[in-house]
Amino acid sequence: MEVSKRHHTVPNFYLKGFGSTDSKPKIGAVSLDDGKRLVMPTSNATVRKNFYALDGHPDGADVFEKELSRIEGDASAVIRKAVEGAWSLSREDREILGTFLTFQFLRGPDTRAWMDQTQGTVLSKVITQMGAEGVRKTLARSDKEVSDEVQNRLIQQAVEPDGIIMKTTPAGHIRHILELVPELVRYFVGRPWVLIRFNRKKLFTCDTPVALVRDPEQEDVCAGVGLMTAWGISIPLTREVGLLLSNPMALVEEAADRKTPRELLEDVISGRYDHEQAGSTKMAQLFNSHTIANARNWLFHHPDDADLVPDELPGPRNREVESEVISG
């Protein structure tokens, strides 16, 4: 059986929602690295060779890629229903789409870079605090033999701006995904969902399309935002349809004297508070601005929408962890 080596970090079916409608759909792409604009087949966008490969797995190195394809197939059918007018979703469809969004939130190179940088930052701090002599004494007591050259390189890298460079394996990344999905999916399905249909305005997408939205009333624009604290989560589904997982706190405050948190959560998951609305200029700006800000290396758009992409774009986002290395 042929083993797939071309792994999409954003599914091809999803990118087709922003592509041309010919037999081999194409999508506009803007590189945040050099500003270059091009048109490519959707099947070639966000492809990384062996990104999820599990070498030596009895079911083939592409076993996780195949599992993602299964999840994508189920989600594709649900998104198609929503785009074609079936809203709100059944509980089963909501859980399918919520699970897909959780996987998408975790599966990209941004998460792997975060893992690399987190481990590298921690190790750099530990080595810097120990000092060269402490590192050598610690390594001398270990079972593994580490050459002086490697020791010196680690000590030197620890005090450099980027610290020690770590590389997470596909297996480590996949383990991280599978551990977190059951925990994080609640923060997707447990929000009121708003489907927004745009007529004149068009949406973009990017290589990390699930974006966290900060509370618009938040005065500190530099404050961090996490999955639990985000005011909302925006996901452009196609160039004309966006999905906003909105803030549940208003519901909690409104129903606090009538329902327990568990009862309210059940109501939310049932879709009782979901609704649909027509897109506005302000809402299109919310989606597109968060898509642009959340992109790491590539912004994508329908080939006919190239003129709508701003000339001024941020550069590539390579740092996922901002932490100063402790000097010692």
Regions found by a protein language model. Give the residues of each.
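Alpha-helical structural context detector biased toward long hydrophobic helices
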Residues: M1-R6, N12-G328
